[in-house]
Amino acid sequence: MAIHLYKTSTPSTRNGAVDSQAKSTPQKQKSLIYGQHHCGKGRNARGVITTGHRGGGHKRLYRKINFRRNEKDISGRIVTIEYDPNRNAYICLIHYGDGEKRYILHPRGARIGDTIVSGTEVPISMGNALPLTDMSLGTAIHNIEITLGKGGQLARAAGTVAKLIAKEGKSATLRLPSGEVRLVSKNCSATVGQVGNVGVNQKSLGRAGSKCWLGKRPVVRGVVMNPVDHPHGGGEGRAPIGRKRPTTPWGYPALGRRSRKRNKYSDSFILRRRK
């Protein structure tokens, strides 16, 4: 990923850094695009804010991504590499030999004109999708299935990559990008390689307005709120939070407290927790 730094001509662009990687800008594939009605903006069915700092943002069209890679043994050609406003990874349009067209996540290093294929007896090369049982140990993978046939659910963000470290019995052992080591069925499929747009964390929006375009509203500290709005609020001047430990706006412990449900069914598949 190529990062372009703005010239310091205005205060808003002085600290900006944007992605300048070459992407094709074709007409969108209309059969794979549809609109979504976003009216919640972080609210639940009662209109109560359950996820903060969401709202506004530019209007988007959703691109239907093929996470299942279910065109078995049919080779496809990468026609475009496109920006997707709904995720931080790029997507690429694939034209398959039977006439089908699909969007998939862009693997790192893939270029327009490259050929990919999915199936059981396909080469272990970048962009190909195949079951874990047919992969060799140490293979870098992404878009990994947890449930057979449901489609990839793990390692889908920009720059993420997992590693196949063991195969025993009916399960395969994976090291995920978070550092977690877990078991997955060997029959689940995954895509070889790393997700593209690796340097996404080097981008700097430079100003608050660019953040608002993404649908992210300002973050306000609880200590500067009123007592009715946050447990940390109130007091005269710069007052401390008045508690032994920080809490969420609803009074639950924050900053370090594990929020994962105890005795969850998938605990038996996790060999080592994430870092």
UniProtKB/Swiss-Prot annotation:
GO cellular component, one term: chloroplast
Gene: rpl2
Matches recorded under Pfam families: Ribosomal_L2 (PF00181), Ribosomal_L2_C (PF03947)
Naturally occurring in which organism (per UniProt): Illicium oligandrum
Keyword Chloroplast: yes
Superkingdom of origin organism: Eukaryota
Name used for this protein in its record: Large ribosomal subunit protein uL2c
Chain intervals with Polar residues compositional bias: 21-30
Region (Disordered): 1-30, 225-275
